[in-house]
Amino acid sequence: SDNVYAIDVEAGKVIWQKHFEYQPVTEGRGLREGDPLCPGGQTATPIIGPLNASGGRTVYALAGDGKLHFLNLADGEELETPVKFGFGNGKSYALNMWNGVIFTTTSQGCNGNPNQVWAIDIHDPQKKVMTFNPKSGGLWGRTGAAVDSTGRVWAPTGDGVYIPEQHTYGNGLIGTKVVDGQLQLQDWFEPSNWAWLKKRDLDMQVTPSIFPFKNHELMVTG
């Protein structure tokens, strides 16, 4: 629907509503009519940023045309010009944020959108989009990528092949991080029985949960 709502949860009232207006998306391969896996429109859950110097907060929302919007949490007004962050109708998943960098992931190749991790530094005047592509499998975690305590961004890769010497990381987990202005692979995990899992369509599809436990940092997915 390309709508964002701010709701007072105590009063049960809508404080403001923002609808994103844009021309029909013409880039990419176009939507597959009737395909529930590529619905088009806004599919990424917005995220609220930390307090800024003036004591306000920004809501970051990715509209269905592939543009990232910067909204005032107090009233929903645009704080700056929206910027491109992926293809329109590209089925981006929930946004996440770490030290001023916003992340999202994509799957299904909707409208020709590559299946990869996406990042954009909101403090970069150029708003350069950074990506890492595992070259196999969609990144299916509905709540996007998870961030560990070191700033590495983790996402599961769907059914695909694992050929690390060809930088192909399907059917596993990839951990990326922004280094020197680029989103780079830092680590990955691949089940020893990945081919067996692929054959049975048992790939990992859940955004990881990351938490501390007894002097370790654990990550759980499924």
Give the positions of each predicted feature.
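Noncatalytic, solvent-exposed loop/strand surfaces
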Residues: 1-222
